[in-house]
């Protein structure tokens, strides 16, 4: 379960950076 949380957090961070670049 821990690795799922890590992947989830990494995915959120990546999406946040992508959104910032787009905007």
Swiss-Prot record:
Which keywords does UniProt give here?
Amidation, Amphibian defense peptide, Antibiotic, Antimicrobial, Cytolysis, Hemolysis, Secreted
Spell out the GO cellular component terms annotated for this protein, sorted alphabetically and separated by semicolons: extracellular region
Name a single GO biological process: defense response to bacterium
Primary location class: secreted
Keyword set includes Cell inner membrane: no
The organs and tissues expressing this protein are described as: Expressed by the skin glands.
Q: Where in the cell is it found?
A: Secreted
Provide the protein name: Dermaseptin-4
Q: Which residues carry this modification: Glutamine amide?
A: 23
Top-level division of the source organism's lineage:
Eukaryota
Keyword Secreted recorded: yes
Give the record's family classification. Answer: Belongs to the frog skin active peptide (FSAP) family. Dermaseptin subfamily.
Give the function comment from the record. Antimicrobial peptide, active against the Gram-positive bacterium S.aureus, and the Gram-negative bacteria E.coli and P.aeruginosa. Has hemolytic activity (5% hemolysis at 128 ug/ml).
